[in-house]
Amino acid sequence: MLTPPRTVVRRDGGLYALERALQRRGFRQVAGADEAGRGACAGPLVAAAAILPPGRRGEVDGLADSKLLTPASRERVYAEVIARASAYAVVVIPAAEVDLRGLHVCNLAAMRRALASLATPPEYVLTDGFGVDGLDVPGLAVWKGDRVAACVAAASVLAKVTRDRIMVELDLEFPGYGFAEHKGYITAEHSAALRERGPCPEHRFSYVNVATVSGRQGAPPRARRPLVAEADEAMERAGVVKGTVGVALGERPWAGASVGNDVAMEGGMG
């Protein structure tokens, strides 16, 4: 990220204070980026970016960190974010790609791709927790950004709802693991199912708990192993697949999609 200008915001200023302070400094298009699924041992990693319009048009009733909302509240807020956002993008990285590239590399690449896919180019970027390099606009990594910046909270909800819907679909495809309940995170139920059934193709074989029960020393099934590991820079050169709004509606992303050919949806009020 480029070095951001100095901006002072009151800690108790509310969810929209940081964006409004930046907008007063002349940054009208402030994008937030966040992810869902970093800590899960099954299912995809999902990153999202969102720009909310300035003023009252960008205020989303009930918007908060997705982890603080009930599933019903998340669905309602998700629909309102989609309706109000000036631009939004969601990128889905399959478990196989997380195993191949590594979690942190995929996480940064996914957020970078989501930001680059916004129909409205951002003038300033806020990210949750850590910075994303390779951006040509100033930005700021905000600790618990999904609780202090509205655009980051909006991205958090987009990523979380998209991923949860995918996990419900995976539960139908791979019954017995409880994906619809725990969404691929480590729980007592999930751990018991792993021990009893072994991992399925949607598990992340690079994770210790999955590798331990797989009996394959962490190697994924042959059907999931790519013949050639392409160079990381290919992830950045390849274009984003456009128009796959179905991902947000619960449809499965295309099998085997990589970071370089990721599944994305785009939209916004324009």
Curated annotation (Swiss-Prot):
Cofactor note: Manganese or magnesium. Binds 1 divalent metal ion per monomer in the absence of substrate. May bind a second metal ion after substrate binding.
EC number: 3.1.26.4
GO biological process: one example: DNA replication, removal of RNA primer
GO CC term (a single one): ribonuclease H2 complex
Pfam families per UniProt: RNase_HII
Places the protein is found: Cytoplasm
Cofactor requirements of the protein: Mn(2+); Mg(2+)
Keyword tRNA processing: no
Entry-linked InterPro entries: RNase_HII (IPR022898), RNase_HII/HIII (IPR001352), RNase_HII/HIII_dom (IPR024567), RNaseH-like_sf (IPR012337), RNaseH_sf (IPR036397)
Protein name as it appears in the record: Ribonuclease HII
Species: Salinispora tropica (strain ATCC BAA-916 / DSM 44818 / JCM 13857 / NBRC 105044 / CNB-440)
Encoding gene, per UniProt annotation: rnhB
